[in-house]
Amino acid sequence: MQGLLILSVLLGAALGKEDFVGHQVLRITAADEAEVQTVKELEDLEHLQLDFWRGPGQPGSPIDVRVPFPSLQAVKVFLEAHGIRYRIMIEDVQSLLDEEQEQMFASQSRARSTNTFNYATYHTLDEIYDFMDLLVAEHPQLVSKLQIGRSYEGRPIYVLKFSTGGSNRPAIWIDLGIHSREWITQATGVWFAKKFTEDYGQDPSFTAILDSMDIFLEIVTNPDGFAFTHSQNRLWRKTRSVTSSSLCVGVDANRNWDAGFGKAGASSSPCSETYHGKYANSEVEVKSIVDFVKDHGNFKAFLSIHSYSQLLLYPYGYTTQSIPDKTELNQVAKSAVEALKSLYGTSYKYGSIITTIYQASGGSIDWSYNQGIKYSFTFELRDTGRYGFLLPASQIIPTAQETWLGVLTIMEHTLNNLY
């Protein structure tokens, strides 16, 4: 096994992958609003090249930041000088990446069917796209593959449609991996796709849903970014579009929707991880979904699955104004997190985006809700920060299983409350 690790490290170096040796993830606890604002000042210091995994929000809420080795001393001195508490969550980011690569290397095999596909390891874009083709070939009466667009770099953007027939039926949308480094989401999407085919005709609740509604599943919403996380930079978040006025690449695709676009909760700096882009829907990965959802016209639920933090969120993120359906969505969220917790005891918080975490503008579920899709929710999957975006592959199946119970709860409510 040690030999595999050495091989994977050497391979990464040979391929020119970005190195994170000595980088640490710090958990900062801002006790009051003044300390939150002080941390935001730190966030604005671009020369430190900080990567906020969980940004500043409510006082007392965890703030997780990856600090490059050359910036560690400066950041720690800054925090200590302001009396702001912090602790080290990840001692060395590269060591986790090496373990992840070793596990993937050891698990490599070409699946000949979806039954032999390894759901307990992370997969590349090509492997996931091959899986889609296998699934469609095995279940042609239930599953079809739609191409809804092409990414900035020209990759096909695929959606799996699960349907038992009929035209323009009420539908449920699920997307995963809009932030490319959140690998647990794409892996969960693959598991979901297989689960749909297994449970139809076997599980009465899911069968009732698919007998009346269609489900559209976008497993890799940001294919360029996802491919880049495998080839160059495991922690890449954004799209890969080029902004003519900047050397920095990419847009935060979950700040690019036409819902409070450009307001507080996104950045106008192309070098920021939360850069909103030049205009709403500038990213083809976003525009493809917008056009598809609008053209369809009969979506009743819109679920966007992210990681991490163990949260179930509903609109709004860009304004403190409560949505008209707050009472109902809050109850649905409560029921969903209770169902999710019932399997492994994983606890989720729930509420509106802006009151539960922080202000975020230009988000997908704010847009979908404003389009009249009442049941709009965002999941933030495991964990709460021990591994962050580098969740071990051993947690893929448990995460997918428990998340499925929450998703199924929302689907059932949608079916029973069609509007």
UniProtKB/Swiss-Prot annotation:
Cofactor note, please?
Answer: Binds 1 zinc ion per subunit.
Which chemical reaction does it catalyze?
A: Release of a C-terminal amino acid, but little or no action with -Asp, -Glu, -Arg, -Lys or -Pro; leukotriene C4 + H2O = leukotriene F4 + glycine
User: In UniProt terms, what function does this protein have?
Assistant: Carboxypeptidase that catalyzes the release of a C-terminal amino acid, but has little or no action with -Asp, -Glu, -Arg, -Lys or -Pro. Catalyzes the conversion of leukotriene C4 to leukotriene F4 via the hydrolysis of an amide bond.
**What Gene Ontology terms describe where this protein resides (cellular component)?**
extracellular space
Please state how the activity of this protein is regulated. Inhibited by interaction with the S.magnifica carboxypeptidase inhibitor SmCI.
Q: What is its main location?
A: secreted
Residues recorded as binding Zn(2+), renumbered to this chain, are H179, E182, H306
Q: What GO biological process terms does the UniProt entry carry, in alphabetical order?
A: leukotriene metabolic process; proteolysis
Q: Where in the cell is it found?
A: Secreted
Q: Keyword check for Secreted, yes or no.
A: yes
PANTHER family (alphabetical) = CARBOXYPEPTIDASE A1 (PTHR11705:SF94), PROTEASE FAMILY M14 CARBOXYPEPTIDASE A,B (PTHR11705)
Pro-segment residues? Answer: 17-110
Superkingdom per UniProt: Eukaryota
Q: What's the protein name?
A: Carboxypeptidase A1
* Outcome of swapping L415V: In allelic variant
GO MF annotation: an example: metallocarboxypeptidase activity
Q: Which family does it belong to?
A: Belongs to the peptidase M14 family.
Listed disulfide bonds for this chain? Answer: C248-C271
Q: Keywords for this entry?
A: Carboxypeptidase, Disulfide bond, Hydrolase, Metal-binding, Metalloprotease, Protease, Secreted, Signal, Zinc, Zymogen
- Entry EC number(s): 3.4.17.1
Give the signal peptide range.
1-16
Q: How does it assemble?
A: Monomer. May form a complex with proelastase 2.
